[in-house]
Amino acid sequence: AARVCASRGHQVILYEATADLGGQVVLAAKATWRAGLIGIATWLADQVAFLGVDVRCNQLADQNTVLESDPDVVIVASGGIPNVGRFEGNGLANTVWDVLAGHVECNGQILIVDESGGHAALSCAEFAADHGAQVEIISPDKVLGTELAQTNMGAHMNELYKLKVRIRPDTRLEKLEREDDGLTATLANVYTDLNEDHRFDLVIGEHGTLPNSDLYFALKPLSTNLGQLDLESLTAAWSQTLAPNPEGRFSLYRIGDAWASRNIHAAMLDAMRVCLHL
């Protein structure tokens, strides 16, 4: 979003809560064969620097931050919060982010519950197995990676088999309980509903992300468009003209995971569609 806006001649301020640009791409690039993904973040960072974007790292933008900047347009790209899934005891589960960021140790028996069908759970399984853990991955689908192209799945399956990751399709996690020696996971077949208990040292839930939208909703009543998007104009990459609150101070849009769980390509397409005619 910052690159497109700056390339169109706008003065852009980019607030980044962490020390480096890149967000989830930085984590995704930590997986075994996906290190090249960091090139996306590196290229975009180089582009915004070249275009003169005012990048302010280690600054978590809030409502006051935005209002002090007196903007004409606000793009909320605040990302999402990991969603481990809906099962009894889900508070005992960790996230893919915990593993890839090194916040938990990858050893012992690890269960990964893939309910999104994307790269995240598979990359986590490969990362954990590569660091010495014995990994089992389950999915309610009949195959892994239902949201991925076959070219990507070939690379993933090669890694999973090479690292001896156990794969269990047609399976859901019903319940997770803390025991003295670890975690007990109740796994059920999605067709027969027959279940059985298994012990693990760590359980990782992957169900995409939930929008990190507090800033968006704080700014919404202050905006001319009340945070609304004309979806027909969005999909056609036309200008956004909605203005139900003409007394508002700025136009407000949210993109990527701040709107709904996205992959890299969809998030960048969101940004292009919204910003192309600003």
Model-derived regions, located:
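Rossmann-like dinucleotide/flavin-binding elements
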Residues: 1-21, 56-70, 77-150, 190-202, ...
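N-terminal Rossmann-like dinucleotide/flavin-binding domain of flavoprotein oxidoreductases
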Residues: 23-68, 148-180, 197
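Interaction-prone hydrophobic/basic patches in short secondary-structure elements
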Residues: 137, 178-183
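SH3/SH3-like beta-barrel fold
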Residues: 184-188
